[in-house]
Regions:
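Extended, helix-rich architectural segments
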Residues: 1-316, 374, 390, 422, ...
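Conserved structured core elements
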Residues: 134, 138, 154, 166, ...
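Generic, well-ordered alpha-helical scaffold segments in large soluble proteins
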Residues: 143-150, 352-376, 426-441, 473-498, ...
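Extended amphipathic alpha-helical segments with heptad-repeat/coiled-coil character used for oligomerization
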Residues: 178, 455-593
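Extended, charged amphipathic alpha-helical segments
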Residues: 279-452, 456
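Charged, low-complexity interaction regions
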Residues: 554-560, 604-611, 629-636
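Long, highly charged low-complexity segments enriched in Glu/Asp and Lys/Arg with interspersed Ser/Thr
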Residues: 562-594, 628-670
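Short amphipathic alpha-helical heptad-repeat segments
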Residues: 610-622
Length: 677
């Protein structure tokens, strides 16, 4: 019995679906009504793919070199003639060091850590001043928050930053996944004439939005000199995917092949001195098994194709031909450093590589100097050492007895001059230049200030300069996320049918269920709820808060600090996680009142609780009553608004009764004091 028979227990192994297809019928009709055959479409796409691959080859080599230097495989360079990365094999003495002292990795890790701190909470602006548009903008804002949580946005953004920093550009591809969402029904299994199941039972779901990451290695634009995706005629994406993943995505069973793809793999780092070959991790092409190429052709909308074109080709066969999702290019580019007039961005590693080579050479020369001194070289008259061959092979080890002839001066250690300070200064200068090129400083990398900088103001200025330079990349990422969010809204509007529900967590630690439909999406004007943190960092916010506090901006007429200012101070100086532990009773009352406001939007009318602080609840409820959300609620659900007004009246009556009771107690106390007097 074969291995396949054991796996499938006597059942037929999966057939290759593409081999059973007929390709005689036309695949599509162009704008003039001419029939287009599958063979012609596939041939055109594949020819374009190879042309673009040749044009992009040098850039691909640069990305691979970037990956090698980041991983520590640095004794290599680009061979333009052979179009590959070759190890540097120049001849040196056996004892000369050629080690790698990787400074690129910690610098890039510092950049990554700072870029991860950026916030991506978004809000959709209403299309007009109409009440309905405000309500729809609120639904769209909640929908974006839901999509971020449902698509594992944070983890994917982390990988997105890594790829953008490595190659200069990373891409996101948003799509509608019919296998996500709530279960509607199950499609029955399909059997052949013999009763064997040819298509198992399949669940039918409402569908949901998702997005994936695409590396620069997989993207082939129509022109390398057209900077924006919207200005490209089309883009081709070539991916090597596992056949199981292809079946999950497209429902097509394939027998996989062995293909080449880029992977990080252990590789020799050339001769490093003393006859040793070190192993380092580097980027290279390796063979992977049971995979197949998936080629995706995306054409921007044009006069002939107003909704664009999307063609998916697997093994020279079209598995999908149609319009772009929602008639818009679903791919977004995230660039670390945009280059004017170029489609692909630039990685900081590319500018760091020449400095890293120089740094390695300088430190290796210093190490050669140290090794030479540590070898204890001798100077002796000719013929004075009897066991010269043995001594030359082993050197002077601890405890060695040196036998020499008294034929002149006795052997002595060779005196070397001190290492010139210029060498050490140059090493430090190169290290400083690398920090400058990477957009960071010693303050950001190791927390140490440059020599001679002791002033607090100067240190704050250095920190602000670092954040400002890093914020350029952060702004590029934030702009790309905004563009992706617009695509999300359009995909939801295009593919959502009927009324749908989404569960999200609110800012007051409560979960909410929102009901919406595609008609609720009518605005694509999106902005962030907060400024780029790298432009206005947490430290800068603390400093601004202290300055405003000193000016009396947070004190009332009696000179007392307001409760909201105290809460803001806890958030800035103690962190968000410590705020909940530091809540006073008044702050808990305020949080409870805000939760009642939010529940009202879900149809839950609040009731006055015996432990409610009426004054605090009145303040929070009246704030909500003056907001646009309450105006929308009053229009949509007037009965709930009336109940909420009655709830406010109940608090006012209870507060008035308490105040009257306190007044009576004060008058009674004053009257008793007068009688005693």
């Amino acid at each position: 019995m074969s291995l396949l028979d054991k796996i499938f227990a006597g059942r037929k192994p999966p057939q290759d679906d593409l081999q059973q297809r007929s390709r005689d019928a036309p695949a599509a009709v162009d704008a003039d009504g001419t029939e287009i055959y599958e063979e012609d479409i596939v041939s055109h796409i594949m020819q374009e793919l190879e042309r673009r691959r040749n044009e992009r080859a040098v850039l691909e080599l640069q990305w691979t070199l970037n990956a090698n230097f980041l991983a520590g495989h640095q004794n290599c360079d680009i061979n333009i003639a052979s179009r590959r990365i070759d190890d540097e094999q120049y001849v040196t003495k056996a004892d000369n060091e050629r080690r790698v002292y990787n400074r690129i990795a910690p610098l890039m890790e510092t950049r990554h850590a700072n870029l991860k701190s950026v916030n991506y909470d978004m809000v959709v602006e209403p299309r007009s001043a109409e009440m309905d548009d405000y309500a729809k903008a609120k639904v769209s804002t909640k929908l974006l928050a839901y999509c971020q949580g449902d698509t594992d946005f944070q983890a994917k953004t982390d990988k997105l930053i890594s790829w953008a920093e490595l190659t200069g550009t990373a891409f996101t591809l948003s799509f509608w996944d019919p296998n996500k969402g709530d279960l509607i029904a199950n499609e029955g299994a399909v059997c052949d004439e013999q009763g064997e199941i040819v298509q198992p039972e399949k669940p039918i779901r409402t569908g949901g939005l998702d997005f994936g990451l695409v590396s620069s290695y997989e993207v082939f634009p129509a022109s390398l000199c057209v900077q924006e995706i919207r200005d490209q005629h089309d883009i081709i994406i070539e991916q090597v995917r596992d056949v199981g993943e292809i079946y999950d995505l497209y429902g097509i069973k394939l027998q996989g092949h062995m293909m080449e793809t880029y992977v990080l793999t252990p590789m020799e780092n050339a001769m490093t001195g003393h006859g040793r070959n070190n192993i380092a991790i580097g980027m290279s092409k390796e063979q992977v098994e049971d995979v197949e190429k998936v080629v995706t052709y995306l054409e921007n909308p044009s006069r002939d194709y107003p909704k664009g074109r999307l063609v998916i080709v697997i093994r020279d066969a079209i598995v999908y031909y149609g319009d772009l999702p929602a008639g818009e290019m679903p791919i977004v580019a995230v660039k670390s450093k945009p280059v004017a007039g170029q489609f692909f961005g630039k990685s900081p590693i590319q500018d760091l590589i020449p400095l890293q080579r120089t740094y390695n050479r300088i430190v290796n020369k210093i190490q050669d100097y140290v090794d030479t001194i540590a070898a204890n070289p001798l100077i002796a008259p000719e013929g004075s050492i009897a066991n010269l061959d043995e001594l030359d092979a082993t050197g002077i080890e601890p405890g060695t007895i040196l036998i020499y002839r008294n034929v002149g001066d006795r052997p002595s250690f060779l005196q070397y001059p001190d290492l010139p300070s210029t060498v050490l200064s140059e090493r430090d200068h190169i290290a400083s230049d690398m920090e400058y090129v990477a957009g960071v400083s010693q303050l950001m990398v190791v927390g140490a200030t440059p020599s001679g900088v002791t002033s607090g103001t100067a240190i704050d200025n250095l920190r602000q300069i670092d954040n400002t330079r890093m914020s350029l990349t952060a702004d590029n990422i934030r702009d790309a996320v905004i563009a992706m969010a617009r695509i999300w809204l359009r995909l939801n509007k295009e593919y959502s049918s009927g009324y749908r529900t989404m569960q999200i967590a609110g800012s007051d630690d409560a979960g909410y269920v929102y009901t919406w439909c595609a008609d609720d999406i009518n605005s694509y004007d999106i902005r962030y709820t907060a400024e780029n943190e790298l432009r206005h960092s947490k430290d800068q916010q603390r400093q601004d808060f202290v300055q405003a506090l000193q000016l009396g901006a947070f004190t009332d007429d009696n000179g007392q600090l307001s409760k909201s200012a105290k809460q803001r101070a806890r958030e800035l100086f103690m962190g968000d996680s410590a705020v909940g532990d530091a809540f006073t009773l008044d702050e808990l009352q305020r949080k409870n009142a805000a939760r009642e406001n939010a529940f009202l939007d879900q149809g839950v009318v609040p009731e006055r609780y015996r432990y409610d602080d009426d004054a605090i609840h009145l303040e929070e409820h009246k704030k909500y009553a003056l907001s646009m959300d309450y105006r929308l609620l009053r229009k949509a659900m007037p009965q709930y608004a009336a109940a909420f007004d009655a709830h406010i009246d109940a608090h006012e009556q209870a507060l008035a009764q308490k105040q009257n009771a306190m007044m009576q107690q004060m008058l009674a106390a004053q009257g008793g004091a007068a009688q005693n007097g």
